[in-house]
Amino acid sequence: MTATQPPVALGGNFLVSPLDEATLFTRERFTDDHRDIEKMVRDFASERVRPNRDALESRNQELALTLLREMGELGLLGIDVPEAYGGMELDKITTAIVAESMGRSYSASFSVVYSVQTGIGMLPVLWFGTPAQKERYLPRLVTGEWIGAYALTEPSAGSDALSGKCGATLSEDGRYYLLNGEKQFITNAAWADLFTVFAQVNGSQFSAFLVERTTPGLTVGAEEKKMGVKGSSTCPVVLKEARVPVENLLYEVGKGATIAFNALNLGRFKLAASDLGGSKAVFEEAVRYAKGRRQFAQAIANFDVIKGKVADMAVRIFAADSMIYRTIGLIQQAVDRLDPAAADYYVQMGEATERYAMEASMAKVVGSETLGMVTDHGVQILGGYGFIEEFPMAGPYRDTRIDRIWEGTNEINRQIVAGTVMKRAILEELPIRTQIRAIDAFLDDEPEAAGGALVAERAALEAGKRLALSIL
């Protein structure tokens, strides 16, 4: 960070500081390049993915991987990856734009395949891999030649991921780690060539390994029969004396939590952005139907109850949109302060996202619950037709339910939000305790509101912050 640059706000700073319009990122600040990429991805989603939705939902592996590799040819699998490894290394704002635009494809299954490939299936290697690991795996992942998967969850370790029983012991000759255990609900598993597997070294050191599909001792189980996202692959992965070369240890022994949670932070954010795109697509279908469906000699869009649902959907979508792009703007500011020439640049990048783990969890909760609400309203607006598979609500209604479970359940993400606030208050990283000590005066004084538009609304927002802090 140079002397002329102001410090980047820590996650949660919005609770103790007024809005800073100079650093508040919104979609209105997209560059021309951002808009060009947005159009390209939307066109791909509408022309290549959506027309093939039915085939993709039948778990057509050949079609899904063909489309994924087409995205690779467009450079869309390597947005975060340096050119040296075949990527484009665009900014983090672009990752949000692409995720949102793919969410409009009306194929949650394909969006899941894409999201895992470019997120938790690739970022651990990019952020924490050795030069040799990056050279071996990233060029294959960014083209779609190889498919990535992320093996963290176990039958007895879901939300409590660090309690996993999968073990790793060093072989007598010191050349291999022998992995034993079972992983559950692994997305992309049946198609994956590379698994990021988490295991306890010597029973207590949570670590990560890059495990190739051809590794002796690794077996992919049968496909799960799921409620939704039926076109994606979800299988258990069993490891029995799986021989993983010591060179495939990712980062360091005992650093698995750092890898897991940094990858999940951005994964949660990307899921939120994808859900935002899905919400907008469902909203458009619901409004289109309401304007065309006539009952009692008029379009049902004229009825106040339908207008109320449309308004509720629009409010939630706007709130999610604002939160998501404000958060990615903060992450981008933090990344911009890093030195790309630093040997640990990508480790620092992962750590930069951790600064906003709270906001990523908030975005995940708001994004997934917005899509759930919007889809539910969409079904209701379509009435009986909303329950019929040929109409555009039944599939999304099933598909969206998983978004409140994976990438950390929404209950766990709410705990992360509350825990982060408490932790940063105790460590005095945020001046929350200082303000709480003066709580009487803090509540008695009227909050000052800046001039200009929305004066009353800004004052109400600041008052709301004071009220929230008073509860602490």
Describe the role of every protein-language-model region.
Residues R175-V220:
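A short core secondary-structure module
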Residues R50-S58, Q295, F318-V366, V379-L382:
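C-terminal helix-coil-helix/basic helical segment that borders enzyme active sites and/or dimer interfaces
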Residues A157-G158, Q184-A190, L266, I402-E407:
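Glycine-rich phosphate/pyrophosphate-binding beta-alpha loops
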Residues T2-A3, A9-G11, D43, E47, ...:
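Alpha-helix capping/hinge segments and adjacent helical runs
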Residues M1-S115, F128, A132-R136, R140, ...:
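Amphipathic, small/basic residue-rich leader segments at the start of a protein or domain
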Residues C166-L170:
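A structural signal for short hydrophobic beta-strand segments in well-ordered beta-sheet cores
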Residues R27-F30, T219-D321, S361, I402-W406, ...:
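Glycine-rich beta->alpha junctions and the first turn(s) of the following alpha-helix
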Residues G144-L152:
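A short, Trp-centered hydrophobic/proline-enriched beta-strand micro-motif
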